[in-house]
């Protein structure tokens, strides 16, 4: 479990080659040295995604290669919302299909209705995809991206611009 948690937390931005080296040369030796119990064939993906889940993702358009499956497992498991660098648009196709039942809304940073879309999705528990993100994000999105929730009574709120919008925990970004 610790290896899988470390995998989700640290390897998402690395290449397949570097991920493998990090696991084999750093993470596994560290865990063994500290007597953390684990199976001989320790594969973080085994705990992160069952074969049925991987098959479902494949049916939703996710490519069957190991890196795509690892990236998908990281994106659905991580506490933070993923930033996908997707020049071949394979991940976008998968996310759109995967989230189609969650009333996925797509928008862009230059869309004049961006904040309205974000408010609607946060309040309605809908998924939202911001496409073509460049190097800088608008600061008004920082509380949303960081999930800076404010608890009032039994409800959570997130600051969107100058408003506090009720946050439904099922919202995905």
Question: How would you name each of these model-derived features?
Answer:
Residues 1-173:
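Conformational switch/transducer regions in large eukaryotic molecular machines and scaffolds
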């Amino acid at each position: 479990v610790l290896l899988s948690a470390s995998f989700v937390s640290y390897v998402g931005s690395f290449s397949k080659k570097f991920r493998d080296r990090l696991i084999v040369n750093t993470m596994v030796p560290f865990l063994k040295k500290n007597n953390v119990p684990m199976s001989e064939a320790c594969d973080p993906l085994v705990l992160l995604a069952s074969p049925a889940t991987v098959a479902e993702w494949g049916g939703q358009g996710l490519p069957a290669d190991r890196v795509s499956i690892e990236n998908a497992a990281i994106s659905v498991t991580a506490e933070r919302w993923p930033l996908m660098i997707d020049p071949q648009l394979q991940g976008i196709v998968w996310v759109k299909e995967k989230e189609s039942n969650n009333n996925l809304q797509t928008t862009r940073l230059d869309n004049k209705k961006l904040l309205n879309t974000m408010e609607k999705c946060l309040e309605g528990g809908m998924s939202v995809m911001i496409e073509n993100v460049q190097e800088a994000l608008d600061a008004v999105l920082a509380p949303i991206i960081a999930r800076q929730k404010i608890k009032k009574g039994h409800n959570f709120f997130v600051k969107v611009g100058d408003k506090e919008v009720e946050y439904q925990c099922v919202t995905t970004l």
